Amino acid sequence: MQTTHPKNLHLTCSGVERGFTNSPKTHPKMSSLKSFIKAVRASKTTAEEHTTILKESAQIRKNIRQGSNDMRMRRKNVAKLLYLFLLGEPTHFGQIECLKLLSSSRFMDKRLGYLAAMLLLDENQEVLTLLTNSLQNDLKSRDKFIVGLALSAFGNVAGPELARDLSNDIAELCSNHHNYISKKAVLCALRVIQKEPDLESLYIEKTDELLHSKSHGVLMAALAFAISACKINPSLISRFESQADDLIYRIRQLSTSTYSSEHNIGNISDPFLQVKILQFLSILGQNNPKIYDKMSDLLAQVCTNTDSSRNAGNAILYQAVRTILDLNSDSSLRVLGVNILAKFLGNRDNNTRYVALNMLKLVVNSEENAVQRHRSTILACLNDVDSSIQSRALELSTFLVNEANVRFMVRELLSFLDNVSDELRGSTAQYITEVTNAFAPNKRWHFDTLLRVFKSAGNFVSESTLSTFLRLIASAPELHEYAVVKLYAALKEDVSQEALTLSAFWVIGEYGQMLLSPTMNFDDDQTLPHSVSESDIVDIIEEVFNSVEASRYIIVQYGLFALTKLSARLGSSSTASRIDKIIYSYKRNKNTEVQQRSVEFHLILNDSKLSKTILEPTPAPLPPPRTTPYQNAEQKLKANKHVEKRVQESNELLDLIGLTTPSVAEPLETPVDEMTQSPQSSLSRAPSTSKKSHFEDILGLFASPAPSAQPVDSLASSFASLDFNASASQPSNNLSLLSSIPSTSKSYPPIVVFDKHDVTLTLVPSKEESTKTAVIEAKFKNKNPMTRVEKIHLEVAVPKSQKLKIQPLRTTSMEPGGETSQTLRVHGPSGSQVKLRLRISVVRQGGSNTLDQVDFGKLPSDLLQ
């Protein structure tokens, strides 16, 4: 008999223990989930962690391929797959393993299987169809907890097809005698109608019954379903109006007595239910005077009786104020709501203060006087340590600025700008600029305010603000001397603020000669220079060149341009020679743009005829437009009607002299919502080609002659140029050409399909009778009056039986309150229903990218008939 050496025996056992056996019948020993997590956390480098994960993934794949029916091993595999999913690793190879786990009759296995299915699967994967049988069986289980698992999984992963297959089973469970199952079934039905709105009729009657339930959970679920259904299909609001009296009675009971001690929070009776009822009543009462009258008394009672010392009470009060605003209640209720929100601002809880500031921003247009009474409290929030509260308080403060308080409010905002963090410095500077442009009492105050902004936040100022500042100075001759002296002194103190340096260079280049012999008396201000020589002016520009970073080439270019202009403004030949040497010294600069400017300006200075023409003083431009940035809808409507009337009167005058469509019409006034103008209207209001801007005059000296611009003719004459069959002598028949264009003879009311992130998407459907094509105009609107949308992108998909043509967006960005649109054309079988899947990407100014998907099938059914 052969004996084994003890050392060899030790090695053999060690190999088996570590799982190195190759026996096909024995599974290698797997580490537990706990040890896997410890191994990942113990990794000292990213590479080591990645290696650990790859080894474990390979082991899981191997176990799955061997096809063991051991449920314990399967649970361990799926648990590790969930951890890999949390780490962002691929887990597609384990999807079938999750479904196999559902075949077990044990609750433990089903719980893990459904959890994995909800996380590792989504409604777009084909493997989801294999889940149908398991869901159908578990929905009929006698164990209410297994039914609950199936309902939860169904609501999270079911797509439109699976929703249609099992919708009847869900409807039956809504009437189940177990409140636990009934509650989950209604919430599941909510998910169903969000994905397939056509199935709402299966659940409406059952929801009516459940709205009378005495169970807290069932009633909450029924209210959530009703709110969502009314938002998806507003025609259902009238269907639920009969429930208003019972809901009003319930909330009166909740606000005056203990309705259910089980759900009390801080002596507040069931605050979650109160909030949900108020949300639903705000929908029911919007267009129903009877419900509105009953709710006015109810809202006053809720606002009076609710304890505001508890956070739960504040939640109810907040929803009550939102309901007051949604219903457009009378002034007394709105003032009461404003007072409640102002009281929130004194709360210690940051969340309470934040939502109060957000809500006050919505009510300031309708109840400005009431909000103005709490101005000091709002301004105090600017000093909060929380930057998000500072940001909301800053936005609200700008809404409070008007002609009467502009000096006080801007002074407070400037004080805030001096101490604010870099995170908010740019937006603060922008807000101050906007309110100053709108309400400045005089030009000197306007200049002084923007100059202080440039001193505090010159590195955060936008190009548009810099342009407005220079335009303000150039358009006001009385500011020229004052501005050049102030900017010269500011430049001597600080050259670190880019906007301040650029504006000082431009102004010194244009009006630098005024520094030599000022006519104004500046003796009272000790910070201003009393005497300046030509060499002092050139010295300050050289000092800036020597102190700025080498990468800030834009400052050098502005400085070279200022020196070039100064050579014509200052009379000394020695100064002109010095300037020429400084400019020519940059001909070997690392930056090609600086090189080019150096050579160009050197050639200009050495050509007396050319320099005399180019370096003439810039003509005064038009002053910056004085527009109010924060107007309510009524003010905008009045302003636009006024503009349309002026344009119409202008067109009528042009008709009298035979010019039906003016080719060189300048607008008498700019509409408030300029972004909403169509491309045709923008063309018809284009400035005359014979009247160039002053900046074009300067640039034209270095450019080649431009081709003569053709006048903008009417739309008919534009189409006439496309008639290739007509002879040259034959007059074009514009009417016949226009008649060949397909006409949209039938239109439909607009439909709002998306309202998130302060962006709304409205679809305006119409039908071309001649081509049987559905034409849908998608209109985006930026509801935020403060921040712009940097980029917006829309992706659209239709069913396979239909064809889609989509035109690009008119503009991919939206100013505050602005709009943009694009046109969709859908062609398909006659009588088919147009259904759209919309994917909307929104990038806000200073914010992150948000991506939302909307499935919409409620378009008119006769679009393709």
From Swiss-Prot:
Family according to the record: Belongs to the adaptor complexes large subunit family.
SMART domains listed in its UniProt record: Alpha_adaptinC2
GO molecular-function terms, A-Z: clathrin adaptor activity; clathrin binding
Biased composition, class Polar residues, residue ranges: 675-690
Gene Ontology CC annotations of this record: AP-1 adaptor complex; cytoplasm; cytosol; endosome; Golgi apparatus
SUPFAM superfamilies (UniProt xref): ARM repeat (SSF48371), Clathrin adaptor appendage domain (SSF49348)
Membrane topology recorded in Swiss-Prot or TrEMBL: Peripheral membrane protein
Region (Disordered) location: 665-690
Keyword DNA damage on entry: no
Record's protein name: AP-1 complex subunit gamma-1
Subcellular location: Cytoplasmic vesicle, Clathrin-coated vesicle membrane; Golgi apparatus
The protein's assembly and partners: Adaptor protein complex 1 (AP-1) is a heterotetramer composed of two large adaptins (gamma-type subunit apl4 and beta-type subunit apl2), a medium adaptin (mu-type subunit apm1) and a small adaptin (sigma-type subunit aps1). AP-1 interacts with clathrin.
Chain ranges passing through the membrane: none
Domain GAE stretches: 746-860
